[in-house]
């Protein structure tokens, strides 16, 4: 009896300690994101309304405490046995316009009117021990009039009393968008919990876009480790005990990138559409005359601020021209995240 009683007390103490630790470390499992790309959002106050002019996206990301039963998820790359796997579903609409949206005529030496609407299923798989990740996105959607980009832009411009876009009758034609996008990232260096240096590479394959990209990424500030998973980058579960109150993140991101593009349906038209329109009784091909630039350089920089379950980010993208003979371009992204 003298032996059993101390053992029972020790076991009860251990169970209580484990329960308290679980309460302190319990992680969130859901993240909802509202994501807005717009070239009017500009950190230098020089907004425009041209080229890649808008992208609106809604995402639901989630983790599971058991292997996914969805057969597609089981086939996607995982970052090892100890990986943190974040699944996601997204809906996005994007639009491109030429510089002068008051003209009704086709403008061959500028970006064509184009719109896309698509659903994305994703798996972001992070290995917190070996500091690498695999991120896979499966994209399915449409481009052309079926994407309703013209109606969306016209409605918003009417709502804010801005000039009406007049050239959507010349937009690139209907076409299916099917793509797989894969990203691999690896941490190269870090300093305590304040600085991380990460390298990444991307491959895009499908009817929407074909190409590759490489980039370094630097994060500086008060932040959770990047490879602890996507959700932890934008929120912190409510802590207890000695961890109580540690729910703030504030950090900057710098990410230059070089991209080689082989095809891009939203810039040059899809595989199955001839992109001809009847203009004044003549069949005219309404897509840019000069073709794609193969190599595009860009710089992404901005900041993330997270307080508890809510966070916001602003990222500015400055890019060299995507089409030969046109202009460089800047797009701002403002996103809000709620984690639970």
Please identify what each model-predicted range represents.
Residues 31, 99-100, 223-340:
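Outer membrane beta-barrel transmembrane domains
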Residues 44-51, 202-213, 292-296, 320-330:
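Solvent-exposed loop/turn segments connecting transmembrane beta-strands
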Residues 22-29, 64-85, 127-135, 188-197, ...:
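Short loop/turn motifs that connect adjacent beta-strands in outer-membrane beta-barrel proteins
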Residues 24-66, 91, 97-100, 261-263, ...:
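Short glycine/proline- and aromatic-enriched beta-strand/turn motifs that initiate or cap beta-hairpins
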Residues 1-26:
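Bacterial Sec-dependent N-terminal signal peptides
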Residues 32-38, 87-95, 138-144, 184, ...:
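Transmembrane beta-barrel strands of outer-membrane/channel proteins
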Residues 55-58, 118, 216, 329-340:
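Outer-membrane beta-barrel "beta-signal"
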């Amino acid at each position: 009896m003298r032996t059993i009683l101390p053992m029972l007390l020790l076991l009860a103490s251990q169970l209580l300690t484990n329960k308290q630790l679980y309460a302190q470390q319990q992680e969130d499992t859901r993240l909802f994101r509202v994501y807005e790309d717009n070239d009017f959002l500009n950190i230098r106050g020089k907004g425009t309304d041209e080229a890649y002019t808008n992208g609106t996206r809604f995402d639901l990301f989630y983790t599971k405490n058991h292997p996914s039963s969805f057969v597609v998820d089981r086939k996607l790359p995982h970052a090892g046995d100890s990986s943190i796997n974040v699944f996601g579903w997204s809906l996005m609409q994007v639009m491109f316009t030429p510089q002068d949206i008051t003209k009704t005529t086709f403008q061959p030496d500028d970006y064509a009117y184009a719109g896309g609407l698509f659903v994305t299923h994703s798996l972001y798989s992070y290995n917190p021990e070996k500091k690498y990740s695999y991120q896979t996105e499966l994209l399915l959607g449409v481009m052309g009039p079926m994407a309703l980009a013209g109606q969306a832009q016209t409605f918003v411009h009417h709502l804010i009393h801005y000039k009406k876009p007049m050239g959507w009758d010349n937009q690139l034609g209907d076409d299916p968008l099917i793509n797989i996008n894969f990203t691999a990232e690896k941490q190269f260096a870090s300093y305590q919990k304040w600085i991380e240096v990460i390298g990444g590479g991307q491959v895009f394959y499908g009817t929407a876009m074909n190409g590759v990209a490489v980039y370094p990424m630097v994060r500086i500030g008060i932040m959770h480790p990047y490879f602890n998973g996507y959700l932890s980058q934008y929120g912190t579960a409510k802590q207890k005990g000695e961890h109580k109150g540690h729910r703030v993140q504030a950090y900057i991101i710098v990410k230059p990138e070089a991209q080689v593009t082989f095809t891009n349906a939203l810039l040059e038209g899809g595989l199955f559409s001839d992109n001809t329109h009847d203009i004044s009784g003549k069949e005219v091909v309404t897509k840019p005359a000069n073709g794609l630039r193969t190599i595009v350089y860009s710089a992404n920089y901005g900041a993330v601020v997270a307080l508890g379950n809510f966070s916001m980010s602003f990222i500015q993208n400055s890019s060299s021209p995507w089409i030969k003979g046109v202009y460089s371009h800047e797009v701002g992204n403002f996103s809000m995240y709620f984690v639970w």
